[in-house]
Amino acid sequence: EPWLVKRPFTAEGLVERYLDDVFGLGPLEDMLSDESITEIMVNGSHSLFYEQEGKLYQAPHPFSDDGQVYALIDRIIGPLGRRVDESSPMVNARLPQGHRVNAVIPPLAIDGPVVTIRKFRSHAFSLDEMQDLGSFDKKIEQLLKWAVLRRCNIAVSGGTGSGKTTLLNALSAVIPFSERIVTIEDSAELRFSEHPHVVRLEARPKSAEGVGEISIRDLVVNSLRMRPDRIVVGECRGAEALDMLQAMSTGHDGSLTTLHANSPQEAVSRLATMVRYGAELPVAVIEAQIATAIDLVVQTTRYPDGSRGICEISGYVWNEEKRHCVVDRYYIRDTVTKESSWIKIPAWLDDLPYLGIAAAKEVAQWKQM
């Protein structure tokens, strides 16, 4: 059922509405508490949309004027010491629950202040739960678990809203409790409710005075001095890609990250571009490092019915003759029909018995699935 206003016009309901206005985020409180809603979009005072189970719905607009939307923005960013005004009309923030907020005001937002809230579940999905929901089958679930335990460097690639962060979180939950994890994010979204040894780092934007910025790249470089067993970067989107690839290639195996790309091949191009933000290296040199550093690229997608899942799993190999990083496809799933097929089996699966991760019989049974 699409979301409906849950505060009745009774004395008790009116008191709850008043308390929401004074202490919470006003008319958005009901949506924030509804676990089935994943995104809230306020387009000025005249338009409110939300995403529920992968589909967009329009809600009754609860704001009487733009002033209420401005008050909402101030309520969010005020405690963080941030501001939004004509000189700085865009801001990113995080709610105490971990939800990510983006606000844009005029003159950039022509029709009034815009607020977008990306919600995150209080309980992170496990690989088991994602498999139960149909994001992938049991064969892929087992492959992903083995890949994490084998300390493969994994990049989760996908478009906006395709479930990259959800999958990254589920993969991270497989990391053994005996290992020290350092997570690095632009806005903290990953959740490690059970792992006993997690250090969470969050980038810091410039202050209102234009100083004090700490970038993802700064944190990646610093994390190498923190004795990490695993480095998890929420999303590679800039010059930090160079340091991430170097870390993956020089002993910090088992690292995880996400990339905004629509295919594993596009991910190579995106990574090469990002590396060049930080160093003027030849493309062939960069692609050779990508082929060396990344063991597995998992492509996520959003299907036409609104569901999310894995549509491709690949590796990378270096083609010396063409001086090019080539996608080595293992598995594909059609993004329309959802029909899937295995093209080949990753060679590293045969290492698992020798590493004590899985018995030879288990691997053989997996190949027959």
Map each language-model feature to its residues.
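Conserved lysine of the Walker
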Residues: K164
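NTP-binding/hydrolysis catalytic cores, primarily Walker-type P-loop NTPases
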Residues: D305-M369
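Hydrophobic anchor at the beta1->P-loop junction of P-loop NTPases
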Residues: V156
